[in-house]
Each structure stands twice: as structure tokens, then as C-alpha cells.
Amino acid sequence: ETKDIADAGGPSPALTTSKNPDLAPLIERVGLEPCPLGDDDPDAAIPGLPSVTFRCLGDGPDVNLSAVRGTPLVINVWASWCPPCIAEMPILASAAADLKGQVQFLGVDIEDRDSAALMMMEGFDADFPSVVDNKGEIRRLMAISGPPVTFFVKEFGVIVGRHNGSLPDDAYLNQLLIRYLGIRR
């Protein structure tokens, strides 16, 4: 397993903190899947994702990570300013498309500009939903020193696997999907 990759250049100083109506045409053009609706009453006794709410990058409601249940989940923490994140985005986009209906993919875009994040996703035809963490809260809550980091979460909300660093290729992601979620692609 690779180690956490430190910030590659860092975030842009101008962070977007709320949905910008000027981005509506770009959001529509990118066509991200809607953000997932969470369970209204997740069982707090089950150890799993932190109870933190992030704004949806595309259309859809804000998302409380601890409430996303019901389907196996792959969470990728990324940023448009992160070269390893850019390198792995096509791998994630392809897997999300191939496994639609079997596995939910959710990106957590950290310390980024919405426009840059949307343009990156558009460039790779990545349409899986992403949420926005402008303040980098997920770093503290999930012990992340820098993106990318990928988490594998069972349908009932328990984190069963974590990969620090960029996913090198489809075959490696496929191995992780089998190991942690029992899902073949």
C-alpha cells in the first residue's frame, strides 16, 4: 500500500463556498449523477463514515457521509490541482460507469474551485457524483494527509478498505473491489 501523497501544489486560493449560479451551464454540460440521498436515521452505533455534511458539486442535496447506506460505496478524495488525482480519474470514471447499479461511487473534492473540479470531471467524462469539501474537513476526520485516497465501504456504512495514493490501473482497482467489496467488474 502506498503512503499518503502530500499536497501537489496545494489548492487555489480562491475557493468556492456555495453553489454559484454562473456554474449552472457547466454543471448541466458535465452531467454528473445526482448526489446520493442518505438514510434519514443512520445507526450511530455502527462504526463507519464520519457524520459530516458536504455540498453536492452537481445537482442534488447536501450529503451526510454517515447516512450514505444501502449500496457498496467507493469514496475517492481528490482535487483538480492534484496530479495523481488527475492520473487516476479515468480509472474511476470507467469503473463507475461499468458498475453502475452495483457500486455507488462518490468523489470528495477537497480545497478546490468548483469550476476547476467540474472541468476536470468533464475532461474525463466522469459523471459519478462528487461533493465539495472546501475546508478540507475530511483530512482531519479520516486522517488524510493529502489526496488521492480511496475508501471502500460496505452497504451498511462500514469502511472495510483504504488505498492511499493514486490507483495505478484498472486491474489494481479491480483487485481492491474484489478484496474489499466482493464485487467483480
Where are these regions (language model features)?
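Structural microenvironment flanking redox-active thiols in thiol-disulfide oxidoreductases
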Residues: 86-124, 134-141
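N-terminal targeting signals for export/organelle localization
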Residues: 1-51, 185
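A short beta-strand-turn-helix
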Residues: 41-46, 51-73
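Active-site acidic short loop of glycosyltransferases
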Residues: 69-71, 101, 144
